[in-house]
Amino acid sequence: VLQAVIYEGLRMRPPLLGLLPKIVPAGGDTLAGHFVPEGTAICANASSLLRSEDLFGPDADIYRPARFLELPNAEAVVSMQRNVELAFGSGQWQCVGRHLAFMEFHKVVFEVSGGLQRNSCRCFLFANL
């Protein structure tokens, strides 16, 4: 449950709120069936990806940690967690502090939740802000 709370919090409020630019290497590359010439800057918007209904379901704008607990198998959980971890970038450009950040997330959520009563709460829809 702790993992689900952390990943859902990270999904709803990613640490990086910008584009993740990359430059297409020499010779160009094919992306989603389209040729992209070398030197072209391409970007991924992590914030949009983390609110994608295709990846996180029709309630992607709702904070609902249970989405990580309702998956059918471990592979689906790992896949969803990897999608959330895109908030830290990917490949050789991934944030070197990712592991430290997750360690701190676990510590903070554990310590803060220790003094709270365990009652169910209403979901909060960020789209209504």
Model regions and ranges:
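Conserved cytochrome P450 K-helix E-x-x-R motif and the immediately C-terminal K′/meander segment
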Residues: 1-32
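Cytochrome P450 heme-thiolate "Cys pocket" and heme-binding signature region
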Residues: 32, 69-105
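Structural recognition of the beta-strand scaffold that forms the well-ordered cores
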Residues: 43-44, 87
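Conserved cytochrome P450 K-helix/beta-meander segment immediately N-terminal to the heme-binding cysteine loop
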Residues: 44-76
